[in-house]
Amino acid sequence: MMADHKSVTRMLKTARGQIDGILRMVEEDRYCVDISTQLMATQALIARINADVLKAHIEGCVASAVESGDEELKAAKLAEIERVVDKLAK
């Protein structure tokens, strides 16, 4: 993975902390809108992490495949990205 490992790890630990906090909120029967707000914040953070990882993949693995001149490898990497984009669009 070409993404900044420290940054990705830090953000994932932040997301884990947010989820732990949300679990406590549910256990404490906190106000639903407050829980929903925290859930949306966590979803946004996870989406950002995913975008960073995918960007690094495109800049690293996909770019290398394109530059390699290997048409089969290039097609495989582009198909891989298409599948991910399709999943994100759902």
Write out the residue ranges for each language-model feature.
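Solvent-exposed interaction patches of small proteins and small membrane subunits
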Residues: 1-90
